[in-house]
């Protein structure tokens, strides 16, 4: 939006995630899924690039799918919120200030909403899947991304993945996948579709050009 207003043409975007500090190491349902990471990306506006397309979505009714119960303004940190508690019959332990996910709900949400969002964006932009060089999905779950690729009838070599190397690095996962898996495949002007989701629930897709 800032670039579109004409204020500047080039920006350095820095993003870092330390998920290991948010999830309890004693919560085996969640902690082992995540990794820490950071990226730096240069974003540029110019006449040499084709038009980009975006789809941004949010549904607050599903806020319980990924959340942290305390530690913010609504439920401030206290002695009570920092107490470790056994949270299920499997002996998983966390405090109210640790994050957690309703895994099955998140999984079902993604399989329902993300394919629809991608198809809608492709229709709006008048592109077919064959005209997109790569599809880069948020690296949350390898099975989930395999399903998305099959649902959209994508060739496997157009859907890079790095979750086996780094785990789920949250907002870093898409640019990290580009750097890790595509850095030697971006010569010329490549058209890439990015799609991710997260807390909210919120989800978004974009078609951009990379050089």
What are the residue ranges of the model-derived segments?
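Claisen-condensing/thiolase-fold acyl-transfer catalytic domains that form or cleave C-C bonds
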Residues: 1-7, 111, 115, 133-211
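Acidic-glycine-rich active-site phosphate/pyrophosphate-binding loop
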Residues: 12-19, 86-91, 144-156
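Flexible, glycine-rich active-site loops centered on histidine and acidic residues
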Residues: 6-38
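Short, surface-exposed connector motifs at secondary-structure boundaries
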Residues: 126-131
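Stable alpha-helical structural segments in soluble proteins, enriched in small hydrophobic residues
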Residues: 117-125, 177
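Condensing-enzyme catalytic core mediating Claisen C-C bond formation in acyl metabolism
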Residues: 27-108, 112, 116, 197, ...
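Acidic, glycine-rich active-site loops and adjacent beta-strand->loop/helix elements
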Residues: 15-21, 57-59, 165-167, 196-201
